[in-house]
């Protein structure tokens, strides 16, 4: 998730607010890092199947920006659809799906894949995580 933590430097320089205004770049950076970290090809298939047994699915990628006390959410679902929504007065109250309280710009992602077990059995598993983008 940290690879996708791109911020608007002009906004930060003039207002000291951390805002991520380029959702597409953040998602693209996330995809590059995911492929590299999990050793995936361009079709999200593992280059070796020792542990991950098939395609890695991006279930959700969500960017939360904080503007005053409001949270602006941009979410990409597994089918590629994008949802944008603003939640008024939710700073410090709203959480990501994995329970992280949103206090600053935050990125959440969830992936799913088939995991090869010890006796060659397989199980579809999910992994999710959140990262806060802060200046301290």
Predicted features along the sequence, with ranges:
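Short, conserved structural patches
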Residues: 4-136
């Amino acid at each position: 998730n940290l690879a996708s933590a791109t911020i608007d430097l002009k906004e930060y320089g003039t207002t000291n607010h951390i805002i991520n205004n380029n959702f597409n770049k953040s998602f693209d950076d996330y995809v590059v890092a995911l492929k590299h970290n999990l050793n995936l090809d361009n079709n999200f298939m593992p280059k070796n199947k020792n542990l991950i047994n098939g395609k890695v699915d991006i279930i959700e990628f969500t960017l939360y920006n904080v503007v005053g006390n409001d949270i602006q959410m941009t979410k990409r679902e597994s089918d590629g659809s994008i949802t944008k929504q603003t939640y008024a007065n939710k700073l410090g109250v709203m959480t990501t799906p994995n329970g992280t309280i949103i206090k600053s710009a935050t990125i959440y992602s969830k992936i799913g894949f088939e995991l090869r077990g010890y006796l060659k059995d397989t199980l579809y598993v999910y992994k999710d995580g959140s990262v806060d983008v802060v200046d301290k």
